[in-house]
Amino acid sequence: ELEITDAIQDLIDHGLTVNPHIVAGWWKDTGKLEDLLEANRLILETFTEQIEGDVDEKSSIEGKVVIEPGAIIRNSVVRGPAVIGNKARIEQAYIGPFTAIMNDVQIQGSEIEHSIVLEGAVITDVASRIVDSLIGKNVRIYRQPMKPSAYRFMLGDNSEVGIRW
């Protein structure tokens, strides 16, 4: 994990000039998941409703929700503040408050809230609600019926998984 001081030092090491500036407004160090989710919450709270995607009559949009052009919402509930990115597809799903769904994400038969889902991720038929999570680019999360019941993981270095029952 790199910190902002590492980036500043790298600029100096490459002979570039680094100058200080006072930042107006809030500042959040997003080096930890909790801080990243808090920054996401603060940003989403500033949004106003903007529905430009395709939402069917079986879906419910509540609160400050941004649905970008090309997004498709089918038989789902989206409760804001939330953003659904371009070309995202949400089907038979619940998208709860403080959730940012980026471009080209697919969520089907699953529930998620207070989370960030990056580009190209696919979440399919997850049995429990996903909360307080950061889902990386092109990640696939799906339920795979296996007997006996089991969890199967492929996790990168320094990963963390919390399982409740």
Annotate each PLM feature:
Residues E1-W165:
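Left-handed beta-helix
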